[in-house]
Amino acid sequence: MSVPSALMKQPPIQSTAGAVPVRNEKGEISMEKVKVKRYVSGKRPDYAPMESSDEEDEEFQFIKKAKEQEAEPEEQEEDSSSDPRLRRLQNRISEDVEERLARHRKIVEPEVVGESDSEVEGDAWRMEREDSSEEEEEEIDDEEIERRRGMMRQRAQERKNEEMEVMEVEDEGRSGEESESESEYEEYTDSEDEMEPRLKPVFIRKKDRVTVQEREAEALKQKELEQEAKRMAEERRKYTLKIVEEETKKELEENKRSLAALDALNTDDENDEEEYEAWKVRELKRIKRDREDREALEKEKAEIERMRNLTEEERRAELRANGKVITNKAVKGKYKFLQKYYHRGAFFMDEDEEVYKRDFSAPTLEDHFNKTILPKVMQVKNFGRSGRTKYTHLVDQDTTSFDSAWGQESAQNTKFFKQKAAGVRDVFERPSAKKRKTT
């Protein structure tokens, strides 16, 4: 409930009055003295209840906010009127204005419908603030104090009369508040709905309602998905059982074959003497083979050592007398004109094989034809294809790239060709194995 504007416009009470209006159990309001108690940190105030419900907590928070809203303007007003002389001047001016207005016209005081507990507590708080400024009011003369006390008593009486009227109004509306509090939320929503424009309700048949159709379609779709999931799970289960069954059959068949092989193995008629003689033969062959390999290795080492001890002339004579033996040496054939060459590779072979001694230079496929009778332009490899060659042979072609750095005529290139380049110097001596020092 808002505070009347007329009461807000009244000047603050600057006196040492220490009484506040208090309502008793019968609803009567009387003035009682206020006993200022010292604040103790962590101690519960006397006015605070021992236990409170959620509604009381909300009401306490609302009262606290109202106190803060009322305290802000009064703090500003008190700060602005900290000077006693300025305060007296303001009070005198306001009183003169009120008296002048009262002489000219009758002021109609607004009717107070009700006063909340926060307002009563706000008045008590203001009076406590006024008591705290008692030391500053010692400079005011006695006549001013008496006049202000009279005004305070008059205003307190008027406030008491107004509160009595408010109590009567509250008693009449108290019976209806209980029923209103139960349906507070519904009335609040109804009040919001009243602000919006109302539309005429139109009946829609159940089968035409979109929401029902969508819900039924969604339920049907969900049911189909569940059935599909069940079907897939059943198929996976059957497939797994089939795989397990096949694996089991394979294991059983393998076990049967193993048992049959063991049954077929009959060692009753074996002769231990024959087995022993066969083992002795195998061991003798192995010993002989190991001895031969060892003797061959020793002979090879002795031959290498002998060749190392020979002089250069003796080594050359030895190599001429005993040429190098090439294993699987093939016959070197003659290739035809533009015949394709197939490289057979080079691998180490310590044993002679007839298949490696064949003539691999024999022509195949298109190489059987005589390509010397073809025109000059067709005497290239892969003629008419993407992989054809540019020249028939490179013997009669100059492939020098004159755009490269080597083809440029410079002092550095000339010096290199004359001193170090091979095949371009006027030297016709046979090169020796050792590099000669050039000065």
Curated annotation (Swiss-Prot):
Its biological purpose: Involved in pre-mRNA splicing as a component of the spliceosome.
Modified positions (Phosphothreonine) in chain numbering: T267
Database matches in Pfam families: MFAP1
Assembly information from the UniProt record: Component of the spliceosome B complex. Interacts with PRPF38A (via N-terminal interaction domain).
Domain of life where this protein originates: Eukaryota
Residue ranges with Acidic residues bias: 71-81, 112-122, 131-144, 178-195
MF annotations from Gene Ontology: RNA binding
InterPro entries associated with the record: MFAP1 (IPR033194), MFAP1_C (IPR009730)
Keyword Kinase: no
PTM sites of type Phosphoserine: S52, S53, S94, S116, S118, S132, S133, S361, S432
Protein's recorded name: Microfibrillar-associated protein 1
Lineage start: Eukaryota, Metazoa, Chordata, Craniata, Vertebrata
Span list, region Disordered: 1-27, 39-200
Organism: Homo sapiens
Coiled-coil blocks: none
Chain residue numbers at which the record places covalent cross-link Glycyl lysine isopeptide (Lys-Gly) (interchain with G-Cter in SUMO2): K67, K249, K357, K371, K381, K415, K418
Chief location of this protein within or outside the cell: nucleus
GO-annotated cellular components: centrosome; microfibril; nucleoplasm; nucleus; U2-type precatalytic spliceosome; U2-type spliceosomal complex
Compositionally biased spans, kind Basic and acidic residues: 61-70, 145-163
Keyword Secreted: no
Subcellular localization: Nucleus
Family membership: Belongs to the MFAP1 family.
Residue numbers of N-acetylserine PTMs: S2
Gene: MFAP1
Annotated keywords: Acetylation, Isopeptide bond, mRNA processing, mRNA splicing, Nucleus, Phosphoprotein, Spliceosome, Ubl conjugation
Listed GO biological process terms: mRNA splicing, via spliceosome
